Regions:
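A structural signal for short, well-ordered beta-strand segments
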Residues: 3-5, 48
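Short, conserved secondary-structure transition motifs
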Residues: 5-15, 182
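Conserved phosphate-binding loops in nucleotide/dinucleotide-binding enzymes
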Residues: 15-70, 84-95
Length: 184
């Protein structure tokens, strides 16, 4: 066994040309997509920095959980990038994960069928689905073992996109996918 330290989760901050930092609440984004200091109108550079109260760039996980749910926040943290690397918090990422989770819920509402996915298939979409599912199980298993959660989640998203194209879902495949996604 080995101990793994998670990388630091950072946040966006803003700095002037002279490299001094500006608290987030004193910054506005304008129509041109750039960031400006409200008081002076000076254009600022968006940088990645350690979260701090003085910069007011601290993300309160309770607020994120309230908005998107604990499952979305937890999955986003695993999806942000390699576990041991530092990475910036971006609420837009949670929104994307939350949408994917809603897509999984929508798929769960579809009717199940008893098609034998291990046998010979005629339907091209089912053949592709079976192939993608096999790739998903293989990749998620390997990536979970090596703590590469971000790439495991990415592969599950690929499978969810394929699964959403189906009118009904093979029961055995859905049952197995629920087991694969449940730790995440």
């Amino acid at each position: 066994q080995r101990l793994v330290n998670q990388g630091m989760i950072t946040s966006f901050a803003f700095q002037r040309k002279n490299k001094t930092l500006v608290p987030v609440d004193e910054v506005e984004q304008r129509d041109d997509g750039n960031y400006y200091e409200k008081a002076t109108g000076e254009q600022l550079e968006q940088i990645i920095a350690k979260m701090s109260k003085s910069l007011k760039n601290v993300v309160n996980p309770d607020e994120e959980i309230k908005s998107y749910g604990a499952d979305s926040v937890r999955m986003y943290e695993m999806f942000m990038g390699p576990l041991t690397m530092s990475k910036p918090w971006n609420t837009q990422g949670i929104i994307g994960i939350h949408r994917k989770q809603k897509k999984v819920w929508a798929i769960s509402e579809k009717p199940l069928n008893d098609i034998d996915i291990t046998g010979k298939l005629e339907d091209e979409s089912l053949i592709n689905l079976r192939k993608t599912f096999a790739q998903t199980i293989k990749k998620v298993t390997k990536d979970t073992d090596t703590l590469n959660f971000n790439t495991a989640i990415s592969q599950m998203m690929i499978f969810v996109n394929e699964l959403s194209k189906q009118e009904s879902i093979p029961r055995a495949m859905w049952s197995d996918f629920v087991k694969v996604i449940s730790p995440y």
